[in-house]
């Protein structure tokens, strides 16, 4: 005797990915924000990429300007990269001179290479989508709303707005551009003219 069981056409629920859960819960957690949920989700997506793909630390989403406390044109991130992203050309010369002096001061049996150390510094990150059209006016609005360096996460006063690096003389953001396939490309954008690098 043969029996056949009829299988019901049941669709099983698919659990959301950890990234999807991270991005969607973050958008809900920023209450009182005047930004659209897709802007918050984009910022959270970039935050996730920086934290887990590029090993940044101390990442925060900012919805209000640290200077005027008005809403930012769009949510920004701030964080600490594992290595310095940008070294001013004059600072690079000073770091090389310092490393050379330290190398000469070492004993003869020590390693002869130069050890150039540039400490990482907090950076602003501007989350964007690749298909967005940015104008100079739009970038100027962002630069007008931010400080030279992002404030330290635990400081509510303006003492954290001054850069600890004397070579940091212009505002800069890391423009994070996300494509439709979730790849992220990063560009350093300065406010104003910057001395060119010499290789």
PLM segments and residue spans:
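Acidic, polar low-complexity intrinsically disordered regions
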Residues: 12-170, 181
């Amino acid at each position: 005797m043969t029996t056949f069981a009829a299988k019901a056409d049941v669709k099983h629920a698919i659990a959301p990915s950890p990234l999807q859960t991270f991005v969607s819960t973050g958008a809900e957690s920023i209450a009182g924000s005047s930004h659209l949920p897709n802007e918050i989700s984009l910022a959270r997506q970039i935050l996730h990429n920086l934290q887990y793909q590029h090993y940044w630390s101390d990442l925060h989403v900012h919805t209000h300007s640290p200077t005027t406390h008005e809403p930012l044109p769009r949510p920004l991130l701030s964080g600490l990269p594992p290595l310095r992203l940008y070294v001013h050309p004059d600072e690079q010369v000073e770091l090389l001179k310092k490393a050379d002096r330290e190398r000469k001061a070492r004993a003869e049996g020590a390693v002869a290479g130069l050890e150039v150390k540039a400490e990482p510094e907090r950076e602003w990150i501007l989350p964007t989508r690749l298909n967005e059209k940015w104008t100079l006016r739009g970038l100027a609005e962002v630069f007008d709303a931010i400080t030279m360096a992002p404030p330290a996460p635990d400081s509510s006063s303006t003492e954290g707005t001054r850069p600890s690096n004397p070579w940091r003389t212009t505002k800069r953001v890391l423009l994070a551009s996300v494509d439709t396939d979730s790849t992220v490309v990063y560009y350093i954008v300065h406010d104003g003219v910057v001395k060119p690098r010499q290789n």
